[in-house]
Amino acid sequence: MSDPLFIFYEEPDPDRWFPGDRFPRRVIRRLLRGRPQPGGVMRWFLNLQTGLELAGIPHRVNDYRGLRRTPGAPAHVVGKPHVVTAIPPGHPIIYGPGVAAHPLENDFWGRADLRLILLSCEWFRAMYARDLPVKIPTAVWPAGVDTREWCPPAALPADREILVYDKIRWQRDRLVPELLNPVMAAVAKSGAKVHHLRYGSYREEDYRQLLQRVGAMVFLCEHETQGFAYLQALACGVPVLAWDRGGFWQDPSMYPDRVKFAPVTSVPYFDERCGRKFADTAAFHGIWPQFLSELNSGRYRPRDYVTSHFDLAGQARAYVELCRTALA
């Protein structure tokens, strides 16, 4: 693939009240809210783009005109799903990892010339491979992590501070009193200063600065397909104690009436260098004292895990190789 890659990524932003109103609304949003914060799908795109630049791999972003002028050139649609239908006929598509939560959410299967679907972890790939209405090759590809930006502080924090990262998506009326509140209370009881951060309520820079101050993070999320937030913490040298209940994928828009799939995990990329896991509140109370005692023992080397698996340029090259094989 010596020719430039045509990379596509767009957030849905349809007109709302009259044709073309999305453009002034975009400007007004920027003025009122500031620069948009990247979510997981945007982060896949940004980190792939950075990795391609570091690896010296030429690419063009959202160049529909250039694609049309290059007969048969593949389109690399990182996301989101609506972009698939914007690719002109005659161009094979590599799609992902910014796909819909489940194949049932889209209806372009069998019409678009999809040569490969990239999913960011194995359990997500397995669910897609099982439930796709037509046979399309799938593969696992997670984006790299920018370990230049996400790095440990020059000196370890003097005081013990713990971050509780709250990405509880569903059933909060039950899980906040049954899980989040007991976790917060146990951390506070141990004498640590507790920081509570809820997903979607912060700016990346504030999160990065907070990770310079804490000695560990408790990560609460039903499931993840890559988990940039906890990987960024690991890259900063912060060990993670992760709630990993396993079991079924429980997106309430699909489960249990339309889709049942298991097992899932909240930490698809994790080993003994990263920290520990617990299944429920009782298990947390059992493992929390041990986890605390191990923080200063040198047992955990979370940054080593990230640097050995999520190099930006290395993952960009892996992306190109997967695409090359699929298009051969």
Predicted regions and their residues:
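Aromatic "clamp/platform" in nucleotide-sugar-dependent glycosyltransferases that forms part
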Residues: 222
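Conserved catalytic-core segment of nucleotide-activated headgroup transferases in glycan assembly
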Residues: 35, 127, 146-204
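Extended catalytic core of nucleotide-activated donor transferases of GT-like folds
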Residues: 43-127
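Donor nucleotide-sugar binding/catalytic pocket of nucleotide-sugar-dependent glycosyltransferases
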Residues: 115-126, 134-150
